[in-house]
Amino acid sequence: MNTRLALVLCAVGSGVLSFSCARTAEPTPAASTHVPVTTAGALSVTPPSSTDRWYQFSRTDGRVHLRACPAPSQPSAPEHFVPWTEAVRLSAVDAQQELLLINRAGVLPATQLARMQTAPVPRKAPSTPAAETTSLTLTPPALLATQSAEGFYSEPIPNSSPHPCQGTGAVFVRLYTDPLFTTSPQDSAAPFLVRYDVRTARWTSVAYTRALGLPRNAQCTALTHTRGTWYASFKSSEAERVSFAYFSFPSLSSLENLGPTQRREHPIGGKVQVPRPISAAAFRAACTPQRLHLPTASTSSDHHSDLHELLVHRLLARVPLSPLYLSARSPCWASDRSFLKTAHRTADERAHHANALIFHPPRARLSAALLTDSGHLYFVREDGSEGHARLSALPPQFVYTSFTLSGPSLIAGWEEQDFFQVGSTGLLCTEVESLTGT
């Protein structure tokens, strides 16, 4: 999930990205234990990291490898850091269809990690290529090899559908190139939105910036769906001038109808549906993260969506961190939703980030879960009870990112961060039951 939307909102109206909103990690204690907490507040400590399996990404000869490794413990050498847009890292998850979006690599089905779970944990970093049972290799599709992949999206399923929260077998992915960071030639003909077919693993182009009448080097920096409408922002660089453009549109298919070049308007259902330019203020009003509050289930006709938003606010209320930027996803939502928890703060307090997932139907007996960048897991069980656990602590400058559940496992991304650069990255797989006691 993309918590970097906060960076985009910092740029709205100014034309310059401010990294003052960049993600920073909460200091973490040295302890490395899983500590489930019941609603009554009683603690029960489980064996330290007994079910953890750590994996690290690497890239050689155009391929991406995921290999079993020991838990992160040492900082990377400075030359190993790259801008976050260029790093091989967990970028987003589709919890409903159990998909992991790996930047610069493609889509990794979470179920593929299952065959690696029984392999012995290495005592030290391997000096030779890992055995087949402890590694996976991904060959990036051409569309993703030179662009950053940011976020899973889907067309909203009508609430009248018998299964309004089920996956459709296809997902959309936003592509982005930052000319300040990339070492690859910028392809002005590349799409900014592509479709991935889960059944066939095929990628197809969907939408192009040229079709919107934007400069050839325009890049889609944000895409979100809220209150029945899609919103997108685009950044263009010309000489030393940076400009932004904003659009709203009713559906992703309205982008697809435009094709790679500008076409005539296409009527859909008797109405013309095309992207329309909007102001920076309109984009900001629609996409600024929601502040913590408790909405009622009658605020819209989408009953499932409202109940799921209530679960998000319930989890947010339990997190003793502020300010906290949260990126949340429900299978009933077409894109991630952003939330902001604020309180009185001092000048030296830092922003924290978290990701939350709603499971519909429940997964591993959980209805919802929230993971902070420091590894605190807050969850709501299917019986309505709440709990809190702690993933293994990471060294300084390492943080947890997106996560999902697959079978008996919780899979969380981890990465080493230094300002806008990223060092080591990988995945942690651990048993859900050891965390939640379910």
Swiss-Prot record:
One of its GO terms (cellular component) is plasma membrane. Residues 1-20 form the signal peptide. A lipid is attached at residue 21 (N-palmitoyl cysteine). Coiled coil: none annotated. It is a lipid-anchor. A lipid is attached at residue 21 (S-diacylglycerol cysteine). Keywords: Cell membrane, Lipoprotein, Membrane, Palmitate, Signal. It is found in: Cell membrane. This is Uncharacterized lipoprotein TP_0456.
